[in-house]
Amino acid sequence: MAAKIKKGDKVVILTGKDKGKKGDVVAVFPKENKALVQGVNMVKRHEKPSQTATGGIVTREAKVHLSNIAIQDPKTGAPTRVGFKTLDDGRKVRFAKASGETIDG
């Protein structure tokens, strides 16, 4: 099955502590059904000092489950579901089901 969420997509968080936040997808992990979204689901990690980096408490993004993410509609900015359609020239593109606007292509 084709990926509905890809790297670089603008997404909206649907549930959890960051509900309503918007961000760009940094990476997608299809085997885990998770994605890394910039500036969302921030967690603190305690890191040991190494020869290259100093130790301390570091804040970074954690993965978010794909079921808690929706693509941002290019027209309205609201969360939307994603569909696929084939254009006249034979290309398969994603489109926002709410507005019918193509997401890529």
Swiss-Prot record:
Protein origin, superkingdom: Bacteria
Coiled-coil stretches: none
Pfam families found in the cross-reference section: KOW, ribosomal_L24
Biological-process GO terms, alphabetical: translation
Disulfide bonds: none
Annotated CDD domains: KOW_RPL26
SMART domains from the UniProt entry: KOW
GO (cellular component) term, any one: ribonucleoprotein complex
Keyword vocabulary terms for this entry: Ribonucleoprotein, Ribosomal protein, RNA-binding, rRNA-binding
GO MF, one annotated term: rRNA binding
Quaternary structure, from the entry: Part of the 50S ribosomal subunit.
Similarity comment: Belongs to the universal ribosomal protein uL24 family.
HAMAP family: Ribosomal_uL24_B (MF_01326_B)
Described function: One of two assembly initiator proteins, it binds directly to the 5'-end of the 23S rRNA, where it nucleates assembly of the 50S subunit. One of the proteins that surrounds the polypeptide exit tunnel on the outside of the subunit.
PANTHER family referenced in this protein's UniProt entry, alphabetically: MITOCHONDRIAL RIBOSOMAL PROTEIN L24
Name used for this protein in its record: Large ribosomal subunit protein uL24
Organism whose genome encodes this protein: Parvibaculum lavamentivorans (strain DS-1 / DSM 13023 / NCIMB 13966)
